[in-house]
A protein has these predicted regions:
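Glycan-association/targeting regions that enable binding to alpha-glucans and other polysaccharides
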Residues: 2-6, 14-158, 183
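Sec-dependent signal peptide recognition
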Residues: 2-10, 166-169
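Juxtamembrane/start-of-transmembrane alpha-helix segments at the extracytoplasmic/lumenal side
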Residues: 154-168
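Generic low-complexity, intrinsically disordered sequence content enriched
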Residues: 8, 17, 172-174
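C-terminal membrane-anchoring or membrane-association module
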Residues: 170-183
Length: 183
């Protein structure tokens, strides 16, 4: 009975994790209460095309900020996310910092956050933890369905297990195995 309960709990948790993210919906963190007034960016990423942002700082931050870094992470249609990369934004004057990246051919979405570095080398992250923004591409795969307004990246061979599901399955099996060993 304990084994059955443990397996049921693991399956419920795995389903909740898999269902918690819905493909194609962009995410945006509020900049209220930060040194950032606004962030302008495209609301869709495209493979091989420029993806840029403009960050406008408060007047106080303009006088004290020496560097603005854009920490990006690109996730691809196979379910893999590349390690985060630091991109230094250029100060174009009047408190506006801008930069550009070019996502690869199989981009699913772009995650990012902003790091503000002051003259004392203190770093303020927006948001404090994780990535605050996620912008989906015009041709994406979220592990169960294709989406976007461009179908050129879609793989006709859907016989394999999607990348997002494999780690969840392995975690569920491992947790169930550990729980049954304790009994």
């Amino acid at each position: 009975v304990h084994k059955l309960i443990a397996i049921a709990i693991v399956m419920i948790l795995a389903f909740n994790v898999a269902a918690s993210e819905q493909g194609g919906f962009n995410e945006e963190t509020s900049v209220e209460g930060t040194d950032i007034i606004s962030i302008d960016y495209p609301h869709q990423a495209s493979a091989g095309k420029s993806f840029g942002i403009n960050v406008k700082l408060t007047e106080e931050a303009q006088n004290n900020t020496t560097t603005v870094n854009w920490i990006t992470q690109i996730c691809i249609n196979s379910g893999i996310c590349y390690p985060p990369e630091t991109n230094s934004l250029e100060n174009s004057g009047e408190g506006i910092w801008n930069g550009t990246i070019i996502p690869g051919d199989d981009v699913t979405y772009v995650n990012w956050r902003i790091d503000l570095i002051d003259s004392n080398e203190n770093t303020t992250r927006v948001p404090e933890n994780g990535f605050g923004w996620k912008v989906w591409s015009d041709c994406w795969y979220d592990g169960s369905e294709w989406g976007g307004n461009d179908s050129s990246c879609q793989d006709d061979n859907d016989d394999n297990v999607p990348g997002f599901i494999t780690p969840l399955t392995l975690a569920a099996i491992g947790t169930a195995g550990l729980m049954t060993r304790r009994d």
